[in-house]
């Protein structure tokens, strides 16, 4: 049931993919590895950043971070909003990535809700889904319900369900569109015979029209 609700939210909020690559930007190296493992298990591509993207990451992230994909911003990002903005802009500008996964590893009323609000403009600006991987055990904690209630953010409470949702999203948009069925014979005549707006027909009269 959780998978149904979360995947429905993804389909309702996400536009058509612009690319198949999955970007992961995280303040926690462990959460990034967990995300990468689940993506790899489902065959989701995680291309490494283009040279121009990597240059921005390397100039912004501490030496003990990872200017790659997954992109480990380290906990320093909490004290350096400029670093967060530069890395998010760089990863979302990279044409290889069609969505961006952000693991949320803690739940705090002020900072977590603030982070969710900070993420919203990126989704609107780049037209790519921002998908929150909610890791705290406090499933309805501050920030979670906020993310679910806004149109720009998509939240999953399981990394496995999140990556499966992305795979289904890709599969749906990969379908070959079929031509619409031909209208049945006599449709035009039947429509012309319909009474005017507001008419009430008995059952036999309605059946006789079709």
Regions found by a protein language model. Name each.
Residues 1-30, 36-46, 117-209:
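Peripheral docking tails and interdomain loops at the edges
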Residues 18-98, 102-105, 114:
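Short glycine-cluster motifs
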Residues 58, 111, 142:
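Short Asp/Glu-rich motifs
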Residues 107-110, 137-139:
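Short, small-residue-enriched loops and turns at beta-alpha junctions
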Residues 110-117:
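Short glycine/threonine-rich loop-to-helix capping motif typified by GTGT followed
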């Amino acid at each position: 049931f959780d998978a149904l609700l979360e995947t429905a939210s993804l389909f309702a909020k996400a536009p058509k993919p612009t690319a198949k690559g999955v970007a992961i930007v995280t303040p926690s190296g462990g959460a990034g590895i967990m995300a990468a493992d689940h993506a790899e298990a489902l065959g989701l591509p995680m291309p490494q950043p283009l040279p121009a993207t990597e240059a921005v990451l390397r100039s912004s992230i501490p030496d003990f971070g990872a200017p790659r994909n997954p992109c480990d911003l380290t906990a320093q990002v909490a004290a350096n909003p400029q670093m967060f903005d530069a890395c998010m802009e760089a990863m979302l500008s990279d044409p290889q990535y069609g969505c961006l996964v952000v693991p949320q590893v803690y739940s705090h009323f002020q900072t977590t809700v603030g982070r969710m609000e900070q993420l919203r403009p990126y989704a609107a600006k780049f037209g790519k889904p921002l998908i929150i991987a909610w890791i705290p055990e406090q499933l309805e904690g501050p920030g979670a319900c906020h993310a679910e209630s806004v149109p720009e953010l998509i939240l999953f409470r399981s990394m496995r369900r999140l990556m499966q949702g992305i795979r289904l999203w890709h599969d749906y948009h990969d379908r070959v569109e079929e031509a619409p069925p031909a209208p049945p014979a006599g449709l035009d005549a039947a429509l012309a015979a319909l009474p005017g707006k507001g008419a009430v027909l008995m059952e036999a009269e309605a059946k006789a029209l079709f």
